[in-house]
């Protein structure tokens, strides 16, 4: 068996891991590193064209953004992900099957669990030719919003663990306190706070954290964020009960064009990539 780290090691973005066996080969994730000189994974045409499977841990661009490129380079295998992840992708692979319906071929073992990063996010344990590998994906045991199936007792010959924030000396609790302190400085002055967040993931966690701190302050969001709030209220597979109960009395409002007085506001684009969102951020900063 050969394992190749084709991206995502020593860099943030283009997560991609190739496993080649005697009878088949597969990828775990195929991410894009936006703005880089080489944004795509380090894969040769032969490696791509002989792939049998692609397993996706979740929908974020640094794990799935190179999917169109992969198919352009000749990938003709089958992509697998949770049903929730497949529903979140901008463009689904030509051959995509949800893991809930996947029966591995003889010689391949695939187990998976929820990784606590966002709705649909998972880790994998894959067995091939007498060896097993654990791929954690973006994994956390401390999410306020999402459920995690712990990997602590999973045994494998090789573990590929996400550690993007490994060098960060602060704990999650410390960073949350810093965020609340910064938000409080604005809210106590009757100023609104704008949070650019990914379409799927930390937005709901921030909404819960901030609502618990200031239950009287209204929450605003763009159309996508409002849809995520509705989804969270009814989902029992990926979200924690604390999230559903904590946000059960919240009636989020559509985000207005101008900053409301003392509001908690969400837009579903962490990079503020449109002129309209840049202008909105300037109005909040003014």
Task: Give residue spans per PLM region.
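Structural motif
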Residues: 30, 197-200, 222-224, 266-272
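Cysteine-dependent PTP/DSP-like catalytic domain, specifically the C-terminal lobe
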Residues: 218-238
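A contiguous, basic/glycine-rich beta-loop/short-helix subdomain that forms a polymer-engagement track
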Residues: 116-118, 232-286
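His/Asp/Glu-rich metal-coordinating catalytic cores
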Residues: 1-55, 60-218, 236, 241-244
């Amino acid at each position: 068996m050969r394992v190749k780290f084709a991206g995502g090691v020593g860099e943030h973005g283009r997560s991609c891991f190739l496993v080649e066996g005697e009878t088949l080969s597969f990828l775990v994730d195929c991410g894009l590193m936006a703005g880089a000189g080489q944004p795509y994974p380090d894969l040769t045409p032969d490696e791509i064209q002989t792939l049998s499977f692609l397993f996706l841990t979740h929908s974020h661009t640094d794990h799935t953004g190179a999917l169109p490129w992969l198919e352009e380079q000749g990938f003709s295998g089958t992509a697998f992900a949770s049903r929730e992840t497949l529903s979140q992708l901008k463009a689904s692979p030509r051959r995509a099957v949800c893991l809930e319906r996947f029966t591995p071929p003889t010689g391949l073992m695939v187990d998976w669990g929820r990784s606590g990063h966002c709705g649909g996010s998972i880790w994998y344990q894959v067995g091939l030719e007498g060896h097993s590998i654990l791929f954690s994906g973006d994994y956390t045991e401390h999410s306020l919003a999402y459920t995690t199936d712990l990997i602590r007792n999973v045994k494998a010959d090789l573990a590929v663990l996400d550690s993007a924030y490994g060098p960060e000396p602060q704990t999650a609790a410390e960073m949350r306190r810093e965020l609340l302190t910064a938000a409080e400085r604005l809210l106590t002055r009757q100023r609104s706070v704008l949070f650019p967040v990914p379409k799927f993931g930390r937005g709901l966690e921030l909404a819960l954290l901030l609502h618990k701190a200031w239950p009287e302050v209204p929450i605003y969001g763009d159309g996508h964020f409002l849809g995520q709030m509705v989804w969270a209220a009814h989902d029992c597979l990926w979200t924690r009960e604390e999230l559903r109960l904590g946000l059960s009395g919240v009636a989020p409002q559509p985000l207005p064009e101008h900053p409301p007085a003392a509001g908690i506001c969400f837009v579903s684009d962490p990079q503020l990539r449109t002129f309209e969102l840049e202008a909105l951020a300037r109005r909040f900063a003014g």
